[in-house]
C-alpha cells in the first residue's frame, strides 16, 4: 500500500472506530432512557430494531450507488449525517422519536459501511486483502467493545441526563 493509501486507510480506520464507539456508548444508556420515557420492553426492541432494519435495507442501495458514483461522495456526507443524527438523541423526548432517530441512524450507517469497505478493497494491494480487512474490522469491533464500557461507566458515575 502506498503512502497516500496508508493515510486513507488510517483515516477510515480511526473514523469508523470513533463512530462505532459512539454507537457503543449508547447501548447501555438507550434502554434506561427509553424506559424513563415510558417504553416497554417491546418498544425498546423497536428502538434497537429500527437501526438494524433500516440498515439492512439500505446497505445494498448505498453499496450500489458507490459502485456507480464512486466512494468519496458518500463518506463525508455519511459521517456528517451520522454525527447530526447522533445529536438528535439529546433532543428526543418520546419513545416514538427514539425509534425514528434510530431508523435514520441506521440509514446513515448504511451509507458508510459498504462504501468504506469497498474503498478499502479498492486501495488494498492484491494479496493483502485479508490482513487489511482484518485490521479494518478490528477498528469496528474495538469500538463496539470500548463504547459500551464507556457508556456503562457514564451511567454508573454520572446521571443519565448528564450523559
Where in the sequence are the language-model features?
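Juxtamembrane helix-start elements in MFS-like secondary transporters
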Residues: 40-48, 133
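Residue-level signature of mid-helix packing/kink "hotspots" within the transmembrane helices
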Residues: 52-60, 144-145
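Paired small-residue
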Residues: 85, 96-104
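Cytoplasmic helix-loop-helix junction between adjacent transmembrane helices
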Residues: 101-140
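Helix-loop-helix hairpin linking two adjacent transmembrane segments in secondary transporters
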Residues: 136-163
Amino acid at each position: 500500500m502506498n503512502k497516500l493509501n496508508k493515510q486513507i486507510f488510517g483515516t477510515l480506520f480511526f473514523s469508523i472506530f470513533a463512530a462505532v464507539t459512539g454507537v457503543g456508548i449508547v447501548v447501555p444508556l438507550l434502554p434506561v432512557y427509553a424506559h424513563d420515557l415510558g417504553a416497554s420492553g417491546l418498544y425498546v426492541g423497536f428502538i434497537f430494531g429500527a437501526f438494524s432494519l433500516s440498515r439492512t435495507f439500505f446497505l445494498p442501495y448505498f453499496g450500489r450507488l458507490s459502485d456507480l458514483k464512486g466512494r468519496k461522495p458518500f463518506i463525508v456526507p455519511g459521517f456528517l449525517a451520522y454525527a447530526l443524527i447522533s445529536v438528535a438523541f439529546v433532543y428526543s423526548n418520546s419513545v416514538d422519536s427514539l425509534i425514528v432517530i434510530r431508523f435514520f441512524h441506521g440509514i446513515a450507517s448504511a451509507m458508510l459501511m459498504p462504501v468504506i469497505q469497498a474503498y478499502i478493497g479498492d486501495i488494498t494491494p492484491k494479496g493483502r486483502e485479508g490482513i487489511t480487512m482484518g485490521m479494518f474490522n478490528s477498528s469496528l469491533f474495538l469500538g463496539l467493545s470500548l463504547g459500551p464500557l464507556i457508556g456503562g461507566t457514564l451511567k454508573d458515575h454520572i446521571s443519565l441526563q448528564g450523559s
